[in-house]
Amino acid sequence: MYYPEPIARLIESFSKLPGIGQKTATRLAFYTIGMEDQDVNEFAKNLLSAKRDLSFCSICGNLTESDPCAICTDPTRDRTTILVVEESKDVLAMEKIREYRGLYHVLHGTISPMNGISPDEINVKTLITRLMDSEVKEVIIATNATSDGEATAMYLARMIKPAGIKVTRLARGLAVGSDIEYADEITLSKAVENRLEI
């Protein structure tokens, strides 16, 4: 189907987002074009601001406006526990439940032998270094319940246990193959509460 070039480029841009197919990208493009100029400008400004003003915390790897992040510098946090997640959006999901008061570590992915992703390509080395220089007594592995998430959890457990640090995994209220960000708050709360030692 023919679209004027500006619309075609906008559709292409939207379709690059995860989970957005051609139909949804087309709907979003036409919706955006129909928005008030002020709303489009605000949307563009917010998008550029997020891209420009956010970076990764040098300690935990979470998205932040300042380095180190607010969680890492919060003196009320339990510094003896680190919860390891795949992505920054998982930190947001865990924070919503208000059940966990320790620190985080964001891997920015998982080990995936099928996709050629090794431990060196995710944020593992900084976790190991961080554990050696801290008072951490427990690492809770909260990777997703997928084959790559499981492989990553097992690898991390093998790397961390020799240091004498307790390694636990979220309990299974989470469906196999599901992502943490989509779990409801009660399920996540119970998964943290009933975590299992690996």
Curated annotation (Swiss-Prot):
Example of a GO biological process term: DNA recombination
Renumbered zinc finger spans (C4-type): 57-72
Top-level division of the source organism's lineage: Bacteria
Keyword annotations from UniProtKB, A to Z: DNA damage, DNA recombination, DNA repair, Metal-binding, Zinc, Zinc-finger
Cross-referenced InterPro entries: DNA_Rcmb_RecR (IPR000093), Rcmb_RecR (IPR023627), Rcmb_RecR_Znf (IPR015967), TOPRIM_dom (IPR006171), TOPRIM_RecR (IPR034137)
Keyword Zinc: yes
Toprim domain sequence ranges: 80-175
Pfam families: RecR_C, RecR_HhH, RecR_ZnF, Toprim_4
Family: Belongs to the RecR family.
General function of this protein: May play a role in DNA repair. It seems to be involved in an RecBC-independent recombinational process of DNA repair. It may act with RecF and RecO.
Xref: PANTHER family: RECOMBINATION PROTEIN RECR (PTHR30446:SF0)
Listed name of the protein: Recombination protein RecR
Species of origin: Lactococcus lactis subsp. lactis (strain IL1403)
Lineage: Bacteria, Bacillati, Bacillota, Bacilli, Lactobacillales
